């Protein structure tokens, strides 16, 4: 029954589009769904709207070969993969599951007995079960795992992605995959689907554990980054070179301190720990503290830069990089973007932004009169102070006495 000839992927962003393209490259018919008509049109021309090495070639091939088609509405398929955003509601870090609910209701209309539905979106514990309830509300003619267990008409699983931006194509194929079924049979169905392209091990568990696994992975990484960032703040106060300190401490055979930076960004590490904290505010104390340390690091960077320009009349500040990590165009939760916004609020300063992976400033910056997107050479020539916020490959060789060390 679970022969996967056609897969429908909901959400064609940084995870959904690569996933759709890889399935299509294995000669599976793929329907990619996105509510943004512009994205749909771009993909159907065999082009891409994001920066990810190798993805442009892959999408061009599978679209031309007829295995990938983009549309704004779901179609009947054997398996459905939901890969939509899970942002926050307001300032209290409440998870916003609206996109998952909308995606669930959209695919419910075309579900048929024997289908598999997979939630890939990183989600708070219990979201997969909630998704099953949303589907059941829309389709009373079908049975779901929370109602009928192993004999349900529809199989449901949570299978979180765990890939590195810039290495997505390779890691989707090579990385181990956590497969969290609402029942064992649900997990078995999902493993068969992912084994179409996954060369790593597919490890079976339940949906709630799979949800918590992804949140735990990113919380662990956040904690380690917070330790490095807190060290950089302490060393600044104590007049110690943090880079030398970490290098020496790491000579201990059981110590591996990470490198500090200007904060933590992206839609994983900067977001996922808050899902744990929101559901468990009294227990997740260390996780919360780490988030606060990393969220506050941009303020520390801003103060360092302001100290450097305090005696300059009408200073020009070059900010190199806006993305949340090197060599990508993803600005979600970027600490570099936060730093630029804070600096721009000091109206006496002009900000020269260099971001080689975008063609125009994001909307948050477009209404700021004292911010310009410029090339690297112009920024280095005109700026009084240079802050390398993101170590894009274009910036690695930058050497200037104007560069501010903020760690």
Swiss-Prot record:
Pathway where this protein functions: Capsule biogenesis; capsule polysaccharide biosynthesis
Q: Which GO terms describe its biological process?
A: polysaccharide biosynthetic process
Alphabetized InterPro entries for the sequence = 6-PGluconate_DH-like_C_sf, NAD(P)-bd_dom_sf, UDP-Glc/GDP-Man, UDP-Glc/GDP-Man_DH_C, UDP-Glc/GDP-Man_DH_C_sf, UDP-Glc/GDP-Man_DH_dimer, UDP-Glc/GDP-Man_DH_N, UDP_ManNAc/GlcNAc_DH
Keyword NAD (UniProt): yes
Say yes or no: keyword Secreted present: no
Gene3D superfamilies according to UniProt: Cytochrome c1, transmembrane anchor, C-terminal, NAD(P)-binding Rossmann-like Domain
Q: Which UniProt keywords apply?
A: Capsule biogenesis/degradation, NAD, Oxidoreductase
A family per Pfam = UDPG_MGDP_dh_C
Instruction: State its Enzyme Commission number(s).
Output: 1.1.1.336
Class in the EC hierarchy, top level? oxidoreductase
Function, in words: Dehydrogenase involved in the biosynthesis of capsular polysaccharides. Catalyzes the NAD(+)-dependent oxidation of UDP-N-acetyl-D-mannosamine (UDP-ManNAc) to UDP-N-acetyl-D-mannosaminuronic acid (UDP-ManNAcA).
Q: Which family does it belong to?
A: Belongs to the UDP-glucose/GDP-mannose dehydrogenase family.
Q: What is this protein called?
A: UDP-N-acetyl-D-mannosamine dehydrogenase
Q: Which organism is it from?
A: Campylobacter jejuni
Per the record, the gene is HS11.16
């Amino acid at each position: 029954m679970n022969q996967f000839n056609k897969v429908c992927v909901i959400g064609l962003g940084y995870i959904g589009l690569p996933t759709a393209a890889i399935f299509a490259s294995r000669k599976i018919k793929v329907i990619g769904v996105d509510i943004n008509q512009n994205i749909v049109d771009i993909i159907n021309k065999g082009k891409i709207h994001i920066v990810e090495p190798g993805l442009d070639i892959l999408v061009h091939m599978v679209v031309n070969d007829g295995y990938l088609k983009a549309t704004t509405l779901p179609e009947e398929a054997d398996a459905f993969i939901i890969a939509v955003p899970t942002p926050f509601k307001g300032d209290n870090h409440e998870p916003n599951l609206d996109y998952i609910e909308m995606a669930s209701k959209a695919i419910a209309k075309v579900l048929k007995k024997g289908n598999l539905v997979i939630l890939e979106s990183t989600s708070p514990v219990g979201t997969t079960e909630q998704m099953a309830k949303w589907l059941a509300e829309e389709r009373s003619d079908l049975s779901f795992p929370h109602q009928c267990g192993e004999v349900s008409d529809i199989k449901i699983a949570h299978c979180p992605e765990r890939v590195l931006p810039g290495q997505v194509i390779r890691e989707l194929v090579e990385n181990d995959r956590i497969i969290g079924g609402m029942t064992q049979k649900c997990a078995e169905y999902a493993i068969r689907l992912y084994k179409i392209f996954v060369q790593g091990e597919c490890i079976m568990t339940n949906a709630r554990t799979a949800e918590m696994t992804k949140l735990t992975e990113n919380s662990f990484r956040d904690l380690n980054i917070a330790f490095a960032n807190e060290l950089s703040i302490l060393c600044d106060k104590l007049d110690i070179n943090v880079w030398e300190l970490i290098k020496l401490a790491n000579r201990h055979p059981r110590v591996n301190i990470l490198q500090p930076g200007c904060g933590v960004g992206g839609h994983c590490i900067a977001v996922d720990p808050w899902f744990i904290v929101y559901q468990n505010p009294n227990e997740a104390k260390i996780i919360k503290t780490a988030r606060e340390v990393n969220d506050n690091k941009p303020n520390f960077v801003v103060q360092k830069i302001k100290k450097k320009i305090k005696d300059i009349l009408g200073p020009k500040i070059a900010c190199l990089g806006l993305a949340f990590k090197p060599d990508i165009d993803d600005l979600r939760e970027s600490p570099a973007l936060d730093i630029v916004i804070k600096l721009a609020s000091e109206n006496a300063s002009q900000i020269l932004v260099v971001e080689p992976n975008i063609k125009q400033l994001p909307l948050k910056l477009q209404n700021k009169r004292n911010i310009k997107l410029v090339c690297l050479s112009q920024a280095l020539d005109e700026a009084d102070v240079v802050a390398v916020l993101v170590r894009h490959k274009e910036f690695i060789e930058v050497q200037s006495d104007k560069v501010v060390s903020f760690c």
